[in-house]
Amino acid sequence: NADIAHLFDPFNLKQGYIIALGVNDLKGKNNLNDLYEGNVGSAKTDICLEDYNKNANTFVGWYAKIIQRIQKMQPHTKFFLVTMPDEGTGNWKEESHAKALHEIADYLNNCYVIDLYHEAPKYDEEFRSKYFCGHMNAMGYLLTAHYFMTYIDWIIRHNVHDFRFVQFIGSDKIPFALG
């Protein structure tokens, strides 16, 4: 797929990525475990830090592989992993997804979680009546963009040391501290 190839093009690398994957994987399923033969995976057992090609065939293994492949080309890139919002249905698939992303962020460098599951309003029936029409409507996407901007700003302000040299990511002018 050309879009996937473009993602890993060494001439198209970015300083940061927002990754929001998993929603389509969960459609029609009770939880992530249904899709991965009962195993969402675990960062400690399913991520091979030395060779991402050896990651386990689980949600965690595949998700981490995307990050690790980019990190191999651009080691200081920042990643913002987006959890699914809580739909207020009591279905624990969103919580399973959020837990998996927190594990990945804790295990890999330069990864942070935009936790819509715990920190955004519930995307319940009332919310959906205002901000959805099948998929999100324009107001829903605008509101979500504001969540992302606010959350990323919060992450940066609470991790200033990690972000002080982002302007040099991808350049040959890497400060000694990033070396």
PLM features: what roles do these ranges have?
Residues 23-24, 64-98:
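Active-site segments of SGNH/GDSL-like serine hydrolases
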Residues 1-53, 57, 61:
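Conserved SGNH/GDSL esterase-like catalytic core that processes O-acyl groups on lipids
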Residues 57-61, 69-78, 106-112:
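Structural alpha-beta junctions
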Residues 2-13, 70-73, 154, 158, ...:
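Surface-exposed acidic, glycine-flexible loop patches that form ligand/cofactor-binding
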Residues 1-7, 78-79, 113-115, 128-131:
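Short intrinsically disordered, low-complexity coil segments enriched in acidic
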Residues 84-179:
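Catalytic His-Asp segment of secreted/periplasmic serine-dependent ester chemistry enzymes
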Residues 3, 59-66, 97-101, 144:
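A general structural detector for well-ordered alpha-helical segments in enzyme core domains, enriched
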Residues 15-21, 25, 78-83, 112-115:
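Structural recognition of the beta-strand scaffold that forms the well-ordered cores
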